[in-house]
């Protein structure tokens, strides 16, 4: 009996998609994997419009993105490119850009928008409801507020909350009742946007935690480091373009002080030395009595 062979044929659209992904991967110096799982279509379109001029975003199947990354790594002789695959999660997409990884992370973070929290979701931070009027008339909503632990009452014909109250701590799972209350109060504790999973540049894949920088804190540390280095350079007399002027000024001041103290007359010290001598003479004369000074002094 002859052996029957079956040939597996790859769908042409998959081949085209992989080739399209490869073009994207080769088009930018910086490639990012991002998570798009929780982004509603309306917000996604807004984000696309915001980032269109600075980066290219493409969604695809994880298996096809993985294949494209592996082929680009092989074709370019750059095996480190495959490190991106380790960052891949369900719902991932690719971004190609010329931005540096830190600026890319900041841009994507700033494109996020507030969103309501869903039942069963984890609170990203302490959720606090401030005291004051809800603007709603008396009705069933009063009981809903009390059911989630809010000190609510009727005030001036409207439902009001008596005091600031934290209804969920960071990490708490939000109940269905609380999610409804927060939605009615138009409180949006969530942020919807593109979350960075990993960014590749020059053989390095950056974890998002590395890219998350407090700019004010970083600037303060940079200024502190500069001041420390500047002082060290001046005190150790290590001339640099930034410190040479201060070093020369300090050396001149020290030399002048020594010259004055040693009564060594120069064009720079003569006035100070004579002034010092005069002051000393007057002090001695004062101790000796008024007759010690002639009329000219």
Swiss-Prot record:
GO terms for cellular component: cytosolic large ribosomal subunit. It holds the Pfam family RL10P_insert. One of its GO terms (molecular function) is structural constituent of ribosome. Gene3D superfamilies: 3.30.70.1730, 3.90.105.20, 6.10.140.760. One of its GO terms (biological process) is cytoplasmic translation. It comes from the Archaea. Keywords: Ribonucleoprotein, Ribosomal protein, RNA-binding, rRNA-binding. The keyword Ribonucleoprotein applies. The keyword Acyltransferase does not apply. Part of the 50S ribosomal subunit. Forms part of the ribosomal stalk which helps the ribosome interact with GTP-bound translation factors. Forms a heptameric L10(L12)2(L12)2(L12)2 complex, where L10 forms an elongated spine to which the L12 dimers bind in a sequential fashion. Forms part of the ribosomal stalk, playing a central role in the interaction of the ribosome with GTP-bound translation factors. Belongs to the universal ribosomal protein uL10 family. This is Large ribosomal subunit protein uL10. It comes from Methanococcus voltae. The lineage of its organism: Archaea, Methanobacteriati, Methanobacteriota, Methanomada group, Methanococci. The gene is rpl10.
């Amino acid at each position: 009996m002859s052996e029957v062979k079956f040939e597996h044929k790859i769908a042409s659209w998959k081949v085209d998609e992989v080739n399209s992904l490869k073009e994207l991967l080769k088009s930018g110096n910086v490639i990012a994997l991002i998570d798009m799982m929780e982004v509603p279509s309306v917000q996604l379109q807004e984000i696309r419009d915001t980032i269109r001029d600075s980066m290219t975003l493409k969604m695809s199947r994880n298996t096809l993105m993985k294949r494209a990354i592996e082929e680009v790594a092989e074709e370019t002789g750059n095996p480190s490119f495959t490190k991106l695959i380790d960052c891949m999660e369900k719902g991932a997409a690719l971004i190609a850009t010329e931005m540096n990884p830190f600026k890319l992370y900041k841009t994507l973070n700033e494109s996020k928008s507030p969103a309501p929290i869903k039942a069963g979701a984890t609170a990203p931070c302490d959720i606090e409801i401030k005291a004051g009027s809800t603007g709603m008339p008396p009705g069933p909503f009063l009981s809903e507020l009390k059911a989630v632990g809010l000190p609510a009452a009727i005030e001036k014909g409207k439902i009001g909350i008596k005091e600031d109250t934290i209804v969920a701590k960071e990490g708490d799972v939000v109940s269905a009742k609380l999610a409804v209350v927060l939605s009615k109060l138009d409180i949006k504790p969530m942020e919807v946007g593109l979350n960075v999973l990993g960014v590749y540049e020059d053989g390095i894949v950056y974890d998002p935690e590395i890219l998350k920088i407090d700019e004010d804190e970083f600037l303060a540390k940079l200024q502190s480091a500069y001041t420390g280095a500047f002082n060290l350079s001046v005190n150790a007399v290590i001339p640099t373009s930034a410190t040479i002027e201060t070093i020369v000024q300090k050396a001149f001041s020290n030399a002048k002080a020594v010259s004055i103290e040693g009564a060594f007359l120069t064009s720079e010290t003569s006035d100070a030395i004579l002034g010092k001598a005069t002051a000393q003479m007057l002090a001695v004369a004062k101790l000796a009595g008024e007759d010690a000074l002639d009329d000219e002094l």
